[in-house]
């Protein structure tokens, strides 16, 4: 596997005010301390569990990563209580004839990725304590979806993070190869709609394609959080995808190309702006995109897809 070089200021380090001479062990402890501080605050301030829509479910996908890192059962139990509150479901309609996948927040939008991201957490909880009821609805929904002749389910960038890892997680649990075939088919559609091969970045959705839509300075407008969703999705997919999968190299190549493009957009202070190629479009940090990029890039450094270096900025990858 070819290795690419990344030189990136990690946003979490910048925010935490770490000393440049701190040891790796001290830096790691400080990061874990920040995770505890933030996550404990969130959970104590939000004891009542909300719906299984993306706004809560995206948090729980991160909370489970915090559990895997720390081993703190309180984190896991918080997500488990949320899953139980939502009956281990996303949207709750049982009438398949009314299931939809355009934008909507009612219970008939079962096939909409905003209501499928919760399945990531359910699969993680299943792997910790196997119980078929935890993934019964996830399997029902995804296997129905895969039985249709549609391939345009992922029409916005967010959807790649929301559902791609669901399919690799369920493949690992079930061994059903259709999950990986449909994963690639749906991703190919999303690519054809949103990916810009010249800049190796994704538009938020079809409404933002250049030159139909432009930034304030007439440039291509790539949304930081949207591309953050995608880079993190690719990292999570590669984490679970079999080494023998016939499409694995495609995902690796795309991940590396995006990592190079993302690193080139980083601001000197360590953050990313909302419009990646036009910082003046919305000046200042876009924190959600910065967090996603930090996760996605660090995953590559920690798992042999990217190699950290202190080379000059124009040689970051």
Can you say where each PLM-predicted feature lies in the sequence?
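Carbohydrate-binding/catalytic loop surfaces
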Residues: 40-43, 60-68, 96-125, 158-170, ...
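Well-ordered alpha-helical scaffold segments within catalytic/enzyme domains
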Residues: 58-73, 117-131, 163-176, 229-247, ...
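Asp-box/WD-like beta-propeller blade repeats and closely related beta-sheet repeat scaffolds
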Residues: 135-161
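Aromatic- and glycine-enriched pocket-lining scaffold segments that form the walls
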Residues: 151-205
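Oxyanion-binding "anion nests"
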Residues: 231, 236-276
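Single conserved hydrophobic/aromatic residue that forms the stacking wall/gate
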Residues: 308-317
